[in-house]
A protein has these predicted regions:
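Catalytic cores of secreted/periplasmic lytic hydrolases that degrade extracellular macromolecules
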Residues: 1-112, 116-170
Length: 170
């Protein structure tokens, strides 16, 4: 319990976030009586996931910069580039566009949207599908909203763990 307990004011001042990763929200998060405690708990769960994803993006960005400067790339590097082009939905071979799109997630915006879309981690989508940001899907892989209009067929994307939701957010 002490490992998870850290002061968000210190995070704001020192910019250090403990690398503690929850795979899902606690089911009893909504039972917390204090709204302030509920919000702090939510931030302590989601913030490290966003920071970790940003670190991964920065690492990938540095790797991409190196590959752009190389005259020849290995088969493994070519495969990595193909995967990143798909991941960021960039047309084949447009590495300059990939570099532009491969950018950090704005932490404050991500936290605000996550809080709103997931009801501070207490929504059905957050609890049943680790869906933090409320991304829609039409391919059948998700959770159907209970009050969806009859003429609609979208679902909310479902994820195996919270980190996957953050990864998909970019």
């Amino acid at each position: 319990r002490q490992d998870v307990d850290y002061d968000l004011r210190k995070v704001r001042n020192e910019k250090l976030v403990k690398p503690i990763y929850f795979t899902q929200f606690p089911r009893d998060l909504d039972n917390l009586q204090s709204v302030q405690l509920k919000k702090e708990t939510f931030i302590k769960i989601v913030l490290p996931l966003i920071v970790a994803e940003n670190e991964k993006i920065l690492d990938d960005r540095e790797k991409l910069k190196v590959l752009i400067e190389k005259k020849f790339t290995s088969d493994a590097e070519k495969q990595w580039l193909r995967q990143k082009l798909l991941e960021y939905k960039v047309k084949k071979g447009n590495l300059d566009e990939l570099l532009i799109r491969m950018d950090m997630i704005p932490v404050s915006i991500a936290l605000a949207q996550a809080a709103k879309e997931s009801g501070w981690g207490t929504s059905r989508f957050a609890l049943e599908g680790n869906a933090i940001f409320g991304q829609w899907t039409w391919d059948g892989q998700g959770i159907a909203p209970l009050k969806r209009d009859g003429d609609k067929n979208h679902k909310i994307l479902k994820f195996p763990i919270l980190r996957a939701s953050v990864k998909a957010y970019k």
